[in-house]
């Protein structure tokens, strides 16, 4: 039962190179001569053909790639988690057990790279079909998804139910073994593409994990890739270069601005806590402090990023935006940061909350976003993930950076903060100098006096030759 990785025409392949590598492994595992041994497996009264055991999969991977059994088990578990191998006895548990548990290879039609992205309409048909077959006894998270999709695509729900009933009617004409196999295949596909709450999303991609390298690999042998490369180098040749004197001047300006704020270069005030055993420096520079130091307030003027990374500076900036009736911009940026770094199980809830509070028509804290960015954001909300609001967040960030941030630096509030900020006094080391031990009690070998050899005129008793 060999399978080829070619997707059906008209469906673009996902730019995810690790999926291509796993597909090549799965294809080699199904080789009739050198692949994993397949046999018919009996489940109760049903016989499932072309099944493999978990121990055979681990043994084949260990022999094929010359790795230990532990590494082979991990590789097999990754294949199961990505839906290329699915269990027959417990389809909801995507785990590889190195025993006689029966598994089966996923058909190429349900490979993630073939059907990506997964459409909401297909998921609604799957849930409707499962709801009819089980007479409403869905899992809790599937019930929530079913209700949400019912509200979201209510205009096409008759089509969803009609498709579900037609598929169930066609399934009755198949054998019991085929029905079981197709049900396991569909369930595995949706467990990978719509994981339950709390389960890891193996297909999640961050902005840094984009398909830049993968697209280059796919385009290496094409003429379009070489045309793009020639155009890139032509633009690079015509680009104006910055003189070295200008670069050095910028480096000197940067170092001169940041030098007083570097504790290694300019020291710490009131004292270095690692030397003086006094934590006053840490107390004055705590994340939340009532009266920030002058150096800390000055750093807010270096860049907008410095202001946002400081909790105290962000709080004062929020007060300033509140006076200008634009505090919803910073609140939206903070909500996007919470979504980006929050728990995976809370991503759908956080996305809905941000949309209802900031982006929905008539929202309580509606933010001003251009129509193009709003369309891209609404398109991404159909399949929510932690990076779905990146475009809108960047738009609001640049709006605050170019408009609100310069006015904040010129405002009376920031000038008053600079005037009221204090400079810590240097702490004296000790009251009694004779009780103070120097940091380096032993002198450096380079500073030790060099011994002088006695001359011939000197006697053995001393340097003057007197016995």
From Swiss-Prot:
A Pfam family the protein falls into: RGS_DHEX
Keywords assigned: Signal transduction inhibitor
G protein gamma domain segment(s): 219-282
Parts forming coiled coils: none
Residues in RGS domain copies: 299-414
Effect of residue 245 to A: Diminishes interaction with Gbeta5
TM region positions: none
Segments of this protein annotated with the region Disordered: 440-467
Alphabetical list of InterPro entries matching this protein: DEP_dom, G-protein_gamma-like_dom, GGL_sf, RGS, RGS6/7/9/11, RGS6/7/9/11_DHEX_sf, RGS_DHEX, RGS_sf
Domain DEP intervals: 32-107
One CC-aspect GO term: protein-containing complex
GO BP annotations, alphabetical order: G protein-coupled receptor signaling pathway; intracellular signal transduction; negative regulation of signal transduction; regulation of G protein-coupled receptor signaling pathway
Its biological purpose: Inhibits signal transduction by increasing the GTPase activity of G protein alpha subunits thereby driving them into their inactive GDP-bound form.
Subunit architecture: Heterodimer with Gbeta5. Interacts with RGS7BP, leading to regulate the subcellular location of the heterodimer formed with Gbeta5.
Name of the molecule in the record: Regulator of G-protein signaling 11
Organism encoding this protein: Homo sapiens
């Amino acid at each position: 039962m060999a399978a080829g990785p070619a997707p059906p025409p008209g469906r673009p392949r996902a730019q995810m190179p690790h999926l291509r590598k796993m597909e090549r492994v799965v294809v080699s595992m199904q080789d009739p001569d050198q692949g994993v041994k397949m046999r018919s497996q009996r489940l109760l009264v049903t016989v499932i053909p072309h099944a493999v055991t978990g121990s055979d999969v681990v043994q084949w991977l260990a022999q094929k790639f010359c790795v230990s059994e532990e590494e082979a088990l991990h590789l097999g578990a990754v294949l199961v988690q990505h839906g290329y191998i699915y269990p027959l006895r417990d389809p909801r548990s995507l785990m590889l057990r190195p025993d006689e548990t029966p598994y089966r290879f996923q058909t190429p039609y349900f490979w993630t790279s073939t059907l990506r992205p997964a459409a909401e309409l297909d998921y609604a048909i799957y849930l409707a079909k499962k709801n009819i077959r089980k007479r409403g006894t869905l899992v809790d998270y599937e019930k929530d998804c079913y209700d949400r999709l019912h509200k979201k695509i209510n205009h096409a729900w008759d089509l969803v139910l009609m498709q579900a009933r037609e598929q169930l009617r066609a399934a009755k004409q198949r054998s019991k073994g085929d029905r079981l196999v197709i049900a396991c295949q569909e369930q595995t596909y949706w467990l990978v593409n719509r994981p339950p709450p709390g389960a890891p999303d193996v297909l999640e991609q961050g902005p840094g994990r984009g398909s830049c390298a993968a697209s280059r690999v796919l385009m290496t042998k094409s003429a379009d890739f070489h045309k793009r490369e020639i155009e890139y180098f032509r633009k690079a040749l015509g680009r104006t270069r910055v003189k070295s004197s200008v670069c050095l001047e910028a480096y000197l300006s940067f170092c001169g601005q940041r030098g007083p704020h570097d504790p290694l270069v300019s020291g710490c005030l009131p004292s270095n806590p690692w030397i003086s055993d006094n934590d006053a420096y840490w107390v004055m520079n705590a994340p939340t402090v009532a009266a920030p130091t002058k150096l800390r307030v000055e750093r807010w003027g270096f860049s907008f990023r410095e202001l946002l990374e400081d909790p105290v500076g962000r709080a004062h900036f929020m007060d300033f935006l509140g006076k200008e009736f634009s505090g919803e911009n910073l609140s939206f940026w903070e909500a996007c940061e919470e979504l980006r770094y929050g728990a995976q199980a809370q991503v759908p809830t956080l996305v809905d909350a941000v949309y209802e509070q900031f982006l929905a028509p008539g929202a309580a804290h509606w933010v001003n976003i251009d129509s193009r960015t709003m369309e891209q954001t609404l398109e991404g909300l159909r399949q929510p993930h932690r990076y779905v609001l990146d475009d809108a967040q960047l738009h609001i960030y640049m709006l605050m950076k170019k408009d609100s941030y310069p006015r904040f630096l010129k405002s009376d509030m920031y000038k008053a903060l600079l005037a009221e900020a204090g400079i810590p006094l240097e702490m004296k080391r000790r009251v009694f100098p004779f009780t103070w031990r120097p940091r380096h009690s032993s002198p450096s070998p380079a500073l030790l006096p060099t011994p002088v050899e006695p001359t011939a005129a000197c006697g053995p008793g001393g340097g003057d030759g007197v016995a």
